[in-house]
Amino acid sequence: RIKTTKYEHLLPLLTQVQDNQEIDGLFLLINTVGGDCSCGLAAAEMIASIKKPTVSLVIGDSHSIGVPLSVAADRTFIAPTATMILHPVRLNGTIIGAPQTFEYFRLIQDRIVTFVEAHTGVAKSRLERMMIRQGMMVKDLGTILVGKMAVEEGIIDEVGGVSEALFWLHQEIERSRKKRQEKK
């Protein structure tokens, strides 16, 4: 049995975060082994477009499509022992038998890399090198980043936990409230 993660249920919830005046910010706890690339990227785009303070905390794993989900927030944290895995787009059990399938996978991967580059400042070429790195994982390509390694690579803003992420979020919410009051 293959474990996958689906993100469809998040899309209407993210819309509510933006639309509901009683919600002042968003705190994302990320612990995923990956899953649906299309929905994951859609959720990441929605998170990035929210005009309220957003913060993410990687607390276990942020593998595959979890990377764009993690970096979509205004501020990103990773627990010291949490991992992020960057690897090429793939589909379990699929044999690529047509050039169109390969091109489709390449298009999905390019969309993901472009999003991560835009939200981290890490160059596309560096992200692609990490995705195809050999030797770090048995029978697979990719790079495993643990805690501060993700910060050193520029993918995550800082190492921290719940208290640091909430502290940042509360500061930003207060700053947003003050700006709204000044406009009145």
Per-range role (PLM):
Residues 1-67, 71-184:
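N-terminal organellar transit peptides
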